[in-house]
Amino acid sequence: MAGWHHGRRVKKSTAVQEALEIIREMITSSDVEENLRLPSEEELALRLGISRLTVREALTILEREGVIARIQGRGTIVNRFARRLTSRIDSAREIGKFIAENGYTVGVDNVQHWWQAATALEAKKLAISEGEEILLVQKRFLADGNPAAFCIDRVPKKLFCDFNFSTADLEQAIFPFIEAHCRCQLTHDVIEIIPAVADTKLARCLQVNEGTPLLRLDAVEYDLEGRAVMYNTEYYLDHFVRFTLCRIVSYMT
């Protein structure tokens, strides 16, 4: 089918996640027309080097998200609004990807990390005891060199299997770092959306005035076994990052 040439193939270990990522790239690419019928499950499986079952799982997720519709007799159709669903807030992704999806070159600076005792709130979020040691990582994200977001990551020390890392390692994406050093597979997160304003520290970090409105996301990342692995607090400037969400209409008749 024209318009669907793609060179990436999927690694078996994260087949569904990678299949989702690649199909999303296909759908939002500039050379793909809206409302284009997707290739068959068999063809997608062949192109991505995965099973039809894995493709079916990925398509089921995309259908649930509202990106595609499977219509009997017509196949799998890309919904017209799919391209507008950038920076989806219902998809757990790295902050850098959200910034890139909004058209900016991503940078990271001011990375700091240390070990500290968990507060009562941190302990509750991570399902550990208050006072247990956690790794705390702070970093600032840039959009075309301008401050765009500030993130605080917290991970229980007891989950680490490998303590051989440096600040330079933490400048990279946090999800692969956690999976490698805690030997787990992150599968989903639960987020809270909290209106916030910049205090003195955030104003200085993000180069805005105190009291500037910010979007705050609190997220707890879970692994395949359902363990709370990481608790994140993220602050965004809305002129650099705008989130979208496709909601299913539900009403009482």
What positions do the PLM features span?
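Short, hydrophobic-biased segments on the C-terminal half of alpha helices
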Residues: 59-60
